[in-house]
């Protein structure tokens, strides 16, 4: 059976993790890349239900699974990811021709990371509305993730946040690791995020030219 790439998506509550999945998935499918989706909630499967509604007609419901962890979000993706690994393996067995599994953690604090037993690669999502101090708080998710997404950039003037300060601090905290600003409502920055994912995580399954060349 071929290796299906596992991409974790973490971040605080309300930062836009689900929105990232909902905007990235149709773009992956348009490129011929076959995704599966797992969402995590502590006591519900509400995110999975929302993703099924949003992606109705785009991805069949059976390929979107909700995991009710019953525990701290980072425990379910780092210290003891057994429930998620079981969900991953079940999906892989049912859909072995898939290319990527997107695994959304429950909303958590800035220390969230993914166990390498669960995810090959992970994206951390923060949002501008939480304040421009967030990147310099030295959270493991901000500093160690493969890609940092700073979402809701359009809200900066309404909350007194400086995108320039966030960019400066992200560079300081992350070194050469990439970060970018997005607005998942309008799609701004989403194609750039997709290109990073293709180049960094899905290079072994992508056989198509870059987005700009294939448009």
Curated annotation (Swiss-Prot):
GO MF: GTP binding; GTPase activity; nickel cation binding
GO process terms (BP): urea catabolic process
Domain of life (superkingdom): Bacteria
Keywords: Chaperone, Cytoplasm, GTP-binding, Nickel insertion, Nucleotide-binding
Pfam families listed in its UniProt record: cobW
Binding-site residues for GTP, renumbered to this chain: 11-18
Keyword DNA damage: no
Chief location bin: cytoplasm
GO cellular component: cytoplasm
Keyword GTP-binding: yes
Subcellular locations according to the entry: Cytoplasm
Similarity remark: Belongs to the SIMIBI class G3E GTPase family. UreG subfamily.
Subunit composition and interactions: Homodimer. UreD, UreF and UreG form a complex that acts as a GTP-hydrolysis-dependent molecular chaperone, activating the urease apoprotein by helping to assemble the nickel containing metallocenter of UreC. The UreE protein probably delivers the nickel.
Annotated function: Facilitates the functional incorporation of the urease nickel metallocenter. This process requires GTP hydrolysis, probably effectuated by UreG.
HAMAP family: UreG
Protein's recorded name: Urease accessory protein UreG 2
Lineage of the species this protein comes from: Bacteria, Pseudomonadati, Pseudomonadota, Alphaproteobacteria, Hyphomicrobiales
